[in-house]
A protein has these predicted regions:
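Short beta-strand elements that form the blades of beta-propeller/WD-repeat-like
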Residues: 18-33, 40, 69-83, 97, ...
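A broadly used, surface-exposed interaction patch
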Residues: 48-93
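Eukaryote-biased, non-catalytic alpha-solenoid scaffold regions
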Residues: 47, 80, 128-134, 141, ...
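Repeated scaffold domains used in trafficking and secretory/extracellular systems
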Residues: 8-23, 55-70, 97-143, 180-195
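Hydrophilic extracytoplasmic domains
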Residues: 170-211
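N-terminal "mature head" segments of proteins
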Residues: 1-47, 51
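Beta-propeller blade signature
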Residues: 40-43, 86-96, 161-170
Length: 211
């Protein structure tokens, strides 16, 4: 049968994934290497990479939290011992400049995240039966029309492998390793937004699928 998914983009990020934000036309990824921050901007419709930059001005205490017009919204923790004290600034990705401070920030564009089921959940044995493998730690599950998207963990020696599985009309069309060598469970394996499935493999390989 033909694959009901269309891969729009697979791109190796310059660092490990740290944050992601979306609006109606773009998705922007923040990745990090040591003290450096990198921003990768993709067109949501085509999946094409529009712009990728490395900041020379932002510190580890600056984080990507939103988009406003052509600017990124950056959160800055003023007091490193008190995370409640934070301010928000507009940031120009092209010029690497902090712009105006925002008096108010609310992220109104939300992507859809899967439901989390930890191993202690009473429903977890049902997922073990459904996947037909001895899964551990937890799984993330989302239904999207006639599609089921889920990530699950398998134990190999003292480490864990996370796999991503996609079913259409209850038939498996995708089942691949998403990460290996893990030491525990980490949520946020994938999300969906406007008929797009978005996930990262091996901490750096960014993928956009049309679903």
């Amino acid at each position: 049968m033909p694959n009901p998914f269309s891969k729009l983009q697979s791109h190796s990020l310059p660092g490990n994934l740290f944050a992601s934000v979306v609006n109606d036309s773009q998705i922007i990824i923040e990745s990090r290497t040591n003290e450096k921050k990198h921003f990768s901007t993709f067109d949501l419709k085509s999946g094409n990479l529009i712009l990728e930059t490395t900041s020379q001005t932002l510190t580890p205490w600056h984080s990507l939290v939103g988009i406003k017009n052509q600017y990124l919204i950056i959160q800055y923790f003023e007091n490193k011992k008190n995370p409640d004290l934070a301010s928000h600034f507009l940031y120009n990705q092209q010029t690497d400049e902090m712009m105006d401070e925002l008096n108010y920030f609310s992220n109104t564009t939300q992507f859809s995240i899967p439901t989390l089921y930890l191993s202690e959940s009473p429903d977890f044995p049902l997922f073990q039966q459904f996947i037909d493998q001895k899964i551990v730690l937890g799984c993330e599950y989302q239904e999207y029309g006639n599609k089921i998207i889920m990530s699950y963990y398998l134990q190999v020696s003292n480490e864990y492998i996370r796999r991503l599985r996609i079913l259409v009309d209850r038939k498996i069309v995708y089942d691949e390793v998403q990460d290996d060598g893990l030491t525990g469970f980490a949520p946020g394996s994938f999300f969906t937004f406007k008929n797009r499935l978005i996930f990262v493999q091996d901490k750096k390989e960014f993928n956009i699928y049309e679903i």
